[in-house]
Amino acid sequence: LLSTAVFASAVTGLQAQNSLTIEQVKDGLYTISGSGGNVGVRVTTEGVILIDDKFPQDFAEIQELVSQVSDQPVKYVLNTHHHGDHSGGNIEYINISEIIAHQNARDNMLRGNQDAPPRLVFTDQTAIYLGGVEVRAFYMGRGHTNGDAVVYFPDLQTVHGGDLLHTIAPFIDYANGGSSKGWVSTM
């Protein structure tokens, strides 16, 4: 599964720039790169599903990049975890999209007084069905945090691992339930 195609929230040369870029991963699946975590963009005939939404100040640029690949609105945002570079844009999306995350990610957002925690949560797994496309999210256990979601696109055999996947080394957020032993098991 992981060997087919993986795109992670890793820091790359592109992310050192101030602006965001969009790149096609597979047909109907894109990644937006820039400072902080990557955003997954799954395009369907009935709307767009975002995996993470970066920082609040990135909202307009993300919307512009999405409009380059789809004329459909963002219907869902699935946060891979609570960190601001993955969920900070929730404040902009909360009134126009459904936001979904693992229960622990929501709890971490509330404990950290973050704006716009998700209204929809899951504990083990969930799925979004939109425009004939299925997107699944799984909680595999503690790792980067205690609320990491791994997102799977079955039709494309591709995963988005949030900050569970890094190009250099894993970052474990122990203060928010992260576990290096759990990360090994999760991976």
Show where each model-derived region lies.
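Bacterial N-terminal signal peptides
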Residues: L1-G13
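Boundary of Sec targeting at the N-terminus
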Residues: A16-Q17
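Conserved beta-strand hairpin/beta-sheet module of binuclear metal-dependent hydrolase folds
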Residues: L20-L65, A149-F153, Q157-D163
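Metallo-beta-lactamase
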Residues: Q24, G47-L50, F55-Q57, Q103-G143, T145-G147, P154-L156, ...
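Divalent metal-coordination and catalytic microenvironments
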Residues: G28, R42, D52, V66, ...
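Active-site metal-binding motif and surrounding structural segment of the metallo-beta-lactamase
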Residues: T45-I49, Q57-I100
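Active-site environment of divalent metal-dependent phosphoester hydrolases
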Residues: D58-F59, H82-G88, R106-L110, T145-G147, ...
